[in-house]
Regions:
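Alpha/beta enzyme core
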Residues: 1-120, 126-144
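C-terminal helical cap(s) of enzyme catalytic domains, especially alpha/beta-barrels
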Residues: 79-93, 135, 147-172
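Small/polar glycine-rich anion-binding or flexible loop at a beta-alpha turn
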Residues: 125-129, 151, 182
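A short, charged, Gly/Pro-tolerant segment at domain boundaries
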Residues: 175-182
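Hydrophobic alpha-helix feature that most strongly marks membrane-spanning transmembrane helices
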Residues: 116, 136-139, 163, 167, ...
């Protein structure tokens, strides 16, 4: 693998899984610790469950992150109507899918304007149009997550539909549109 993506934002882990990514100094400390033990590029994956994602991204960049990926899942919860108990063993856990795309897009836009390192956009991406929107918002690359759980061929289908979608919107080269919405 050519790089390491360090998830400082997992809401599904007891005992600090998300807490590393909710405070700028804690995220920076993790970034420095990982950078100290590898020569590979380090990408820090951020949580949307914060008040100011820009300050956290900047702290990671200042600590040596080679890139920022965002967003991880949003904190969510469901209750079983029969048992009246939380469905998720941890009570709360990661909520993902198309519903979080607008939040992810906003955060990619904000962070990409604030940092100089590459930004990888993710969160609710399920179509070639979503990829183009992410790139217009400032993502230099895009990841697909939850869509692959619904359709194991989602990533392949998105890549295959990109040329037609690019033509539809008059896009010759994807890299030319990065940050085009700024």
């Amino acid at each position: 693998m050519g790089w390491l993506e360090v998830n400082v934002s997992c809401p599904n882990v007891h005992g600090g899984g998300m807490s590393f990514g909710t405070q700028p100094e804690a995220a920076a400390e993790v970034t420095r610790a990982v950078k100290a033990v590898t020569t590979k590029p380090v990408i820090i994956k951020l949580s949307p469950n914060v008040t100011d994602i820009v300050s956290i991204a900047r702290a990671c960049e200042d600590a040596g992150a080679d890139g920022i990926s965002l967003i991880n899942t949003m904190l969510g919860m469901r209750v079983n109507l029969r048992t009246r108990k939380p469905v998720i063993a941890n009570t709360m856990g990661g909520f993902s899918g198309p519903a979080i795309f607008p939040v992810a897009l906003r955060m990619v836009y904000q962070v990409s304007k604030a940092v100089k390192v590459p930004v990888i956009g993710m969160g609710g991406v399920s179509s070639a149009e979503d990829v183009i929107e992410m790139m217009l918002a400032g993502a230099t690359a895009v990841e697909v997550g939850a869509a692959n759980l619904v359709n194991p061929f989602a990533s392949r289908d998105i890549v295959r539909s990109l040329p037609e979608t690019m033509e539809k919107y008059g896009i010759q080269i994807l890299s030319d549109i990065i940050g085009g919405a700024h």
